[in-house]
């Protein structure tokens, strides 16, 4: 989103829950491997819960006619956790996966799967914040590479032995609920294939130029014309079933597909749709396909702004490309000029300070480069300045920080540039239960000649809290699924599509507003390239988050 005027911003405090980050493999597959626990005997498990949290176990019918075990919990208005744990000594092969059946009637609290050593000090886990618990029995599987060292004094990060297993519901949104478990299994797997992902390409209609998308030569391309009755298709064959994390495409000039779908197949005959793009903007397209596995990928081109298309490159990306939303953003940031994404996504250490009232229920953050996180775990507002036909971001200025009068809890960030100075100040007012965050942007011409400036304020789907933060409040990605812009009223409503949106009020009416989905072009790139959509097209947009 672009707001093209210096403005003070007021954020009404409305609850917003960060969208679930889910990176698990789910499939309706039959039981496999060694059964560790069928959840038939409740006495094998014990409840683990923090103070003032209520929890109990309850036997219920299982997925396949046997028994299962439900954890009924109530957070009683306090923070904490509830879970079930049992002794289960395990030694691990070189590669493996856990699987279990799950269903629940629960708010979107965090689901944690923990493996604990004999001393109880070292813990490995899979943590799924804001988990969307399915109402029906659903197969869940976690592979070895998805199990991380959570904490513990032992420097060994590879899990070789554990003594206990635990399922935990961690308070993210609170409330009460029931989560049921059945059929916990462990399956040895073949060694992972870490060889490069090499694909051969073919096209329908047949085209000799199809091979150009895999030749790493930007001067060649698969080219053709769109046909609504028989859409052109490109098929990539990996030679055998492989795991991968996404797809990157490089289009040529004005000939690109703005609408296309991505499908996968294990046998080359039956296809499953995994992604559809409806408003692509050409250039570089990054398509996240987390935790995918297939031999064939098919790209069906449905249309574009020109009669024809030219696809210069189609590359299947490894699992790490989009293992998590934060990994995906980091992959895109790596391929983008420094400054278009926050430091934390480029491996740099960012610094920030908190903004809030004493004892407040919610707090914001302001980062060293002037971005402001409106509330804990929420999206952020980032400044850009356009002058002399260029867009200047944090990487193009010298930034310093200060407190009001040297000690008051009113932080400011100062941008110094040969053509201007920008001061960003944030503070909060109100009481503990009802507080507001304010921001002031002051843009100054520091030269001797008159100039035209645009101050652009971008709502971006990540926190100031960096992606390296993984405990308590995981940092990084904070999706914006819905934007409603009212330029006349000076308000922006932004949310994840499931929880009440946060409202941003501009005290000075902007000269223009604009919004776009990630598929239509990341907003920093659009600003830098002068491709901002008109305000008439931006009154409302869905899926403004990074598409994951």
Please report, for each region that a protein language model flagged, where it lies by residue.
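Extracellular ligand-binding interfaces
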Residues: 75-154, 170, 174-180, 248-277
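Short carbohydrate-recognition loop motifs
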Residues: 57-80
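Terminal accessory carbohydrate-recognition/targeting modules of carbohydrate-active enzymes
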Residues: 212, 317-548
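Extracellular carbohydrate-recognition regions
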Residues: 32-52, 188-205
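Disordered, acidic Ser/Thr/Pro-rich linker "stalks" and the adjacent N-terminal cap
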Residues: 61-63, 72, 188-244, 250-260, ...
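Short beta-strand-plus-loop segments that form exposed binding edges in beta-rich domains
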Residues: 167-174, 300-307
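Extracellular beta-strand elements of beta-rich domains used
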Residues: 39, 142, 165, 182-186, ...
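Noncatalytic modules at the cell exterior or secretory-pathway interfaces
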Residues: 159-166, 291-302
